[in-house]
Amino acid sequence: MVIGLIDVDGHKFPNLALMRISAYHKARGDHVEWWMGDLFHYDLVYMSKVFSDAYSPDKPEPLNADKVIKGGTGYHIHLRDGKEYLDDSHADLPPEIESMRPDYSIYPQYGYAISMTSRGCPRSCPFCLVAPKEGRKSHKVADVSEFWTGQSVIKVLDPNITACKDKRDLLRQYRDTGAWIEFTQGLDIRLLNDDDIADLNSMKLKNIHFAWDNPNDNLAEKFRAFSKKKCS
């Protein structure tokens, strides 16, 4: 089969779903490439988008494919009274694709690994779609080795790893890679304990920041306590 991929959001950041889809089809012996236009025939084309139409307008469906599959959070976000909502039709990737190690070769311009080792968040912030999409309990979904193939930098996409009951295991897995770790999502200072700080201090940290989603929360004491043991 000839498989075409369309990253509707553009190529400013690797699309994890498309990387897994590519890995799955290549493992089956299919030819996978970025969709090249309507001059070429494709057996199947995948269109994926993370962001809503407000940020990533949809693209016309290919006319030269036997089948087109459109997926990703961006196709299921709707605006109501100025607020984004996720509809109930959103579906995860099939387990046989979700379990694939990402195919980094489709994004050669990026030399880092990306990982999503836990999903869900207990905070349910009104501006965030993680809780309705992934649940209000942070839970481990993968090991770091399922994403990392020796890259010197790992960008961690976990929405709230500090809320995960398996965070000790996950943080130490990241540490043990010896790679530079970049937490792309804010860590939750309210859930950080001494063991967490020790694990963070033992990593090669490229970037770390904290989510302060409710300005009415007085977290000054938490930040003062953290600063005394802050990561180097």
Where are these regions (language model features)?
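Short, charged, surface-exposed secondary-structure boundary motifs
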Residues: 15, 43-45, 57-58, 77-88, ...
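Flexible, charged surface loops at secondary-structure boundaries
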Residues: 37-43, 62-65, 108-109, 146-151, ...
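Conserved acidic residues
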Residues: 42-45, 126, 152-154, 206
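Ser/Thr/Gly-rich flexible loops in soluble cytosolic domains mediating phosphotransfer, phosphorylation
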Residues: 66-102
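Canonical Radical SAM [4Fe-4S] cluster-binding loop centered on the CxxxCxxC motif
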Residues: 107-146
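Conserved SAM/AdoMet-binding glycine-rich loop
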Residues: 147-232
